[in-house]
């Protein structure tokens, strides 16, 4: 069974997310643990957490298919000490919010070194992750591949491996693969050889069991453009045929697919339908 969903709004409460996910045709989701554009975050109440867990069970959503995404302001690679410290403290709080809700995975962008260089940036990321992981429990941090721009660290999967190799609690660090970011950085998943190379790289660097989520996004710009502009499924440069190639791999089918495409719930429902239309149109076998 394909595990698919979208990044869902929390404006009406955490407890609305499971039902809203089912309403758009999904069985998986990603949420922000708080206002993504704020340094402020607070733990949900016991009542809110209980209601959320009840709705998860009621709507039949597996906890392995539920994810949080860290806030936009966090930058563990920042050379600015105040920003780095605030990032560490907010990430700790996000881990605690995940624990309270019962969510096992927290996705993060590794960060931007802001011109100070990859090595220094990775050192700061590792120090930040160690500070977070050594002072929290349970939740697994997912390192997401990012677009190659603005000093971003993680546009190459080997950069994510460098980070994970240096972290104390490696068992609490896994990965997310974003199709738009990867395409933006030269990973061509529109061809069978490209997907095979990607899977081989993930297996070699991390082990495929460490790939916990796929951010399923088309790209508004061509291969290697380094623009980081998501597009709706089938409407970008990956396109229907490209996604058909990607979807045909069993290793890809085993991982939850989370849409971060333009629009809200209505558009995400349409994109989920589009995914299944592509699967049917190209005769892709699904277990």
UniProtKB/Swiss-Prot annotation:
Keywords in alphabetical order: DNA damage, DNA repair, Endonuclease, Hydrolase, Metal-binding, Nuclease, Zinc
Broad EC category: hydrolase
Cofactor: Zn(2+)
Gene3D superfamilies per the UniProt record, alphabetical: Divalent-metal-dependent TIM barrel enzymes (3.20.20.150)
Residues annotated for Zn(2+) 3 binding in this entry: 181, 228, 230
Annotated binding of Zn(2+) 2, by residue: 144, 178, 215, 260
Cofactor: binding comment: Binds 3 Zn(2+) ions.
Binding residues annotated for Zn(2+) 1, in chain numbering: 69, 109, 144
Listed GO MF terms: deoxyribonuclease IV (phage-T4-induced) activity; DNA binding; DNA-(apurinic or apyrimidinic site) endonuclease activity; phosphoric diester hydrolase activity; zinc ion binding
Known catalytic reactions: Endonucleolytic cleavage to 5'-phosphooligonucleotide end-products
Biological process, per Gene Ontology: base-excision repair
EC number: 3.1.21.2
Organism domain of life: Bacteria
Function description: Endonuclease IV plays a role in DNA repair. It cleaves phosphodiester bonds at apurinic or apyrimidinic (AP) sites, generating a 3'-hydroxyl group and a 5'-terminal sugar phosphate.
Listed PANTHER family: APURINIC-APYRIMIDINIC ENDONUCLEASE, ENDONUCLEASE IV ENDODEOXYRIBONUCLEASE IV
Family: Belongs to the AP endonuclease 2 family.
Protein name: Probable endonuclease 4
């Amino acid at each position: 069974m394909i595990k698919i969903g979208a990044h869902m709004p929390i404006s009406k409460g955490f407890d609305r997310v499971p039902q809203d996910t089912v309403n758009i045709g999904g069985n998986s989701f990603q949420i922000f643990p708080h206002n993504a554009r704020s340094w402020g975050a607070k733990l949900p109440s016991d009542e809110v957490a209980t209601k959320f867990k009840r709705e998860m069970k009621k709507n039949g959503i597996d906890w392995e298919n539920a994810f949080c995404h860290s806030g936009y302001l966090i930058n563990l690679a920042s050379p600015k000490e105040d920003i780095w410290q605030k990032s560490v403290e907010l990430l700790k709080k996000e881990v605690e919010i995940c624990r309270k809700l019962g969510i096992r995975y927290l996705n993060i962008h590794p960060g931007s070194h802001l011109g100070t260089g990859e090595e220094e940036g990775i050192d700061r990321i590792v120090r930040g992750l160690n500070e977070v992981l050594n002072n929290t429990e349970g939740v697994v941090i997912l390192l997401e591949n990012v677009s190659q721009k603005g000093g971003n660290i993680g546009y190459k999967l080997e950069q994510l491996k460098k980070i994970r190799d240096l972290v104390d609690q490696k068992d609490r660090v896994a990965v997310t693969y974003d199709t738009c970011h990867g395409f933006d950085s030269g990973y061509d998943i529109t061809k069978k050889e490209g997907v095979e190379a990607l899977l081989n790289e993930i297996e070699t660097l991390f082990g495929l069991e460490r790939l916990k989520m796929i951010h399923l996004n088309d790209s508004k710009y061509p291969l290697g453009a380094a623009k980081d502009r998501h597009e709706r499924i089938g409407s970008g440069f990956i396109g229907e045929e490209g996604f058909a190639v990607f979807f045909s791999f069993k290793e890809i089918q085993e991982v939850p697919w989370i849409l971060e495409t333009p629009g809200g719930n209505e558009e995400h429902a349409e994109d989920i339908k589009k995914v299944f239309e592509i699967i049917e149109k190209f005769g892709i076998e699904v277990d």
